[in-house]
UniProtKB/Swiss-Prot annotation:
GO terms for biological process: L-arginine biosynthetic process. One of its GO terms (cellular component) is cytoplasm. It comes from the Bacteria. This is N-acetyl-gamma-glutamyl-phosphate reductase. Pathway: Amino-acid biosynthesis; L-arginine biosynthesis; N(2)-acetyl-L-ornithine from L-glutamate: step 3/4. Its EC number is 1.2.1.38. Keywords: Amino-acid biosynthesis, Arginine biosynthesis, Cytoplasm, NADP, Oxidoreductase.
């Protein structure tokens, strides 16, 4: 039985992960924590999320005493916190010997030079960063099992990389073009005008400048053109990706490449049949559908995930179970 502390439990991702871990026979929840300045401290989780009324846990402030209690009692800590907050908390808990599963972007790049540009801070813990493993569960299981510092991928990179990594050896130098739409929960729980019911509308954002683009590039090993879109639905991501494959590539070659997922129970691959967001919402699954034109050499692959599940909480749970061999 492994004991897990969840920091940032009042947000969509933290609450979703709480529900997932609560349902696991081999895991227990050491505690749920929020910032000492949070208006939610002291509240039962079910006050914020009535659908979790079966989870009788309260949101505690992350005081120094709480940190000491986590170190004494927990086997791992999950950080569902802002990037700049995770930066320091992850390094501290790692130094105390706990396994750290960070859902922010603070440890996703191995190159410290990336952080000022994409996250607005200098990375102060290069020695911890050097130990961090990118937690793309279907691809990095051995590394996840071997380290105590796991950077859980972003939602868009999870959808995109799950679709693209099998094709890496077949790609030409032409940039893959990724157009992805996410539900409004991807913007977080904090009230914002552009995500309010009366204002939200399908629109691109972060064009040629979204921080998930270099994350995808780093893990794929090739430049991409990535355009995210805000959708007028609650949860889910659909990424439609167009790539050019090397001359002589056949449909059979593509099918063989995607056979890498034959033993991956959470990834479904279909030829000439494309996924729908509704089919993956509230599941830990990724559905892929692809079609290849041998004459032009262009392939279109669509990837559907739940941004709060496979794109965040359920992938963190995958990483926890891989790390602890559960």
């Amino acid at each position: 039985m492994k004991n897990i502390a969840i920091i940032g439990a009042s947000g969509y991702t933290g609450a979703q992960l709480t529900a997932l871990i609560h349902a696991e026979a081999d895991l227990t929840i050491q505690g749920l924590y929020v910032s000492e300045n949070s208006l939610d401290k002291g509240k039962p989780l079910a006050d914020l999320y009535p659908s979790y009324s079966h989870i009788a846990l309260t949101l505690s402030p992350l005081s120094d005493d709480a940190k000491a209690k986590i170190v004494a009692e927990a086997d791992a800590v999950v950080l569902a916190t802002e990037h700049s907050v995770s930066l320091h908390l992850a390094a501290w808990f790692y130094s105390q010997g706990l396994a750290v599963f960070d859902l922010s972007g603070a440890y996703r790049f191995s190159d410290v030079a990336q952080y000022p540009k994409w996250y607005g801070f200098e990375h102060e813990y290069p020695e911890v960063l050097a130990k961090a493993v990118y937690g793309l569960a279907e691809w990095n299981a051995k590394e996840i099992a071997a380290t105590k510092m796991i950077a859980v991928p972003g939602c868009y990179p999870t959808a995109s990389l799950t679709a693209l990594k099998p094709l890496a050896s077949l790609l030409t130098s032409a940039y893959p073009v990724i157009n992805a739409v996410s539900g409004v929960t991807g913007a977080g729980r904090k009230a914002q005008l552009h995500t309010s019911f009366c204002e939200v509308s399908l629109t691109p954002y972060g064009v040629l400048g979204h921080r998930h683009q270099p994350e995808i590039v780093t893990q794929l090993g090739q430049e991409v053109i990535f355009t995210p879109h805000l959708g007028n639905f609650k949860r889910g991501i659909l990424a439609t990706i167009t790539v050019q494959l090397k001359p002589g590539t056949t449909t059979a070659d593509v099918a063989a490449a995607y056979s890498v997922y034959d033993q991956a129970p959470l990834v479904t691959v279909k030829h000439n049949q494309f996924p729908k967001v509704d089919d993956v919402v509230l599941t830990p699954n990724c559905h892929l559908g692809w079609k290849f034109d041998e004459n032009s050499g262009y392939l279109v692959v669509a990837s559907a995930i739940d941004n709060l599940m496979k794109g965040a909480a359920s992938q963190a749970l995958q990483c926890i179970k891989i790390h602890f061999n559960l």
